[in-house]
Amino acid sequence: MSFNHHTIEELHELLVAKDISAVELTKATLEDIKAREEAVGSFITIAEEAALKQAAALDAKGIDPDNVMSGIPLAVKDNISTKGILTTAASKMLYNYEPIFDATAVANAYDKDMIIIGKTNMDEFAMGGSTETSYFKKTKNAWDRSRVPGGSSGGSATAVASGQVRLSLGSDTGGSIRQPAAFNGVVGLKPTYGAVSRYGLIAFGSSLDQIGPFAPTVRENAQLLTVIAGSDRKDSTSAPVQIADYTSKIGQDIKGMKIALPKEYLGEGIDPKIKETVLAAAKHFEKLGAIIEEVSLPHSKYGVAVYYIIASSEASSNLQRFDGIRYGFRAADAKSLEDIYVKTRSQGFGDEVKRRIMLGTFSLSSGYYDAYFKKAGQVRTLIIQDFEKVFADYDLILGPTAPTAAFELDTLNHDPVAMYLADLLTIPVNLAGLPAISIPAGFADGLPVGLQLIGPKYSEEVIYQAAAAFEATTDYHKQQPMIFGGDS
């Protein structure tokens, strides 16, 4: 029996009433995963033995009636450390790496008695926008298996969209939660920088990375964020902010809420069908009582260039630790220490990772630092100031999540610049450290279209309020792909 159509609260009621046990729910989830895995390829590791053991222990202890997450399975992106469970970052470099500690986000999930069911596929070291750079497999879109799921958290998005799991965790450095959420018609949120601990997240861009939740609905997404968020002494970038319940404003009306619509987000490079969907969503918000006005974010057009200098520079530094000495892959044919370094990194990293390491090393090198990295930091400040000016007068910003719907497999993975431009609407949010959500807002040629809502720092509750108001008066989130059991 499958329980993938039940909300978290419905599952909780069944568990508390003992209509099902945690073991039965875990077994049913494992069956859902296996039944769909060949079609979509969401997972790198299915932690069957560990999950069933954890579920049995929970049944023996008893489900906590006051903890809605008790006994709920959770899929985790494979760059988030899980003690005793392979954590590969989808790279040959870490093909055999089992961490000896849990990421704080995972530890928080365990504290709420959630069941870690497996590790999801991703772009290698989170570098990509299509989940095609993984060393292990290419994940496929839940709605059309000839198309990409987005990236880099593609596996976490398809796992939810295809009905394998109800909840999953991803990470977002330049759009890696929101873009795959949009491509697969699910809800994905990138929290404020510092709202969720990065301890245990395999670093890509340290000033940009954030762990965040995927779910089929806004409320369930907020419930999962409530579990993983919070201040953490183990993370020096963790913010001293504690929100007790991110669902607190869900259900409140949005009359009088001021929402900005940047003209740059509907300009050059945006598919006309995406633009049409977003403008229709804006009108829907007006019907709900919100005030929609056009604004300008003039420096957002530089976001992609700024991002790829800063993110690649940080990656070139972060990835120096992978050298074949301490853990992970080591080249077998090396004859000296230098040979180990060179051959291990040449053979262990994929092409996209090596491309970004080289770009970052160049940007940080003597003679080019001021021209590239320093200049990128200055323009980043201008992007931040643009957002601050808008948020002085508006509660939220509305726009498309991605400039197109999901593109076909093997079309952009050989064109790095085109792939990078797919993130042009999500990147500025990371550069400014802001929270943003992608919610289902319609379809273009049968493929899901995501609507992005951006807020000032620590405004996740308001973002959820607006997103839930839209969701409650539309049915896009209820439409499911055939693999889930839907009509499309």
UniProtKB/Swiss-Prot annotation:
InterPro entries for this protein: Amidase, Amidase_CS, Amidase_dom, AS_sf, GatA
Active site: K77 (charge relay system), S152 (charge relay system), S176 (acyl-ester intermediate)
GO cellular component: glutamyl-tRNA(Gln) amidotransferase complex
EC number: 6.3.5.7
Reactions the enzyme catalyzes: L-glutamyl-tRNA(Gln) + L-glutamine + ATP + H2O = L-glutaminyl-tRNA(Gln) + L-glutamate + ADP + phosphate + H(+)
GO biological process: translation
Broadest EC class assigned to this enzyme: ligase
Keywords for the protein's UniProt record, in alphabetical order: ATP-binding, Ligase, Nucleotide-binding, Protein biosynthesis
MF-aspect GO terms: ATP binding; glutaminyl-tRNA synthase (glutamine-hydrolyzing) activity
Source species, domain of life: Bacteria
Family according to the record: Belongs to the amidase family. GatA subfamily.
Protein's job: Allows the formation of correctly charged Gln-tRNA(Gln) through the transamidation of misacylated Glu-tRNA(Gln) in organisms which lack glutaminyl-tRNA synthetase. The reaction takes place in the presence of glutamine and ATP through an activated gamma-phospho-Glu-tRNA(Gln).
Complex formation: Heterotrimer of A, B and C subunits.
Listed NCBIfam families: gatA (TIGR00132)
Listed name of the protein: Glutamyl-tRNA(Gln) amidotransferase subunit A
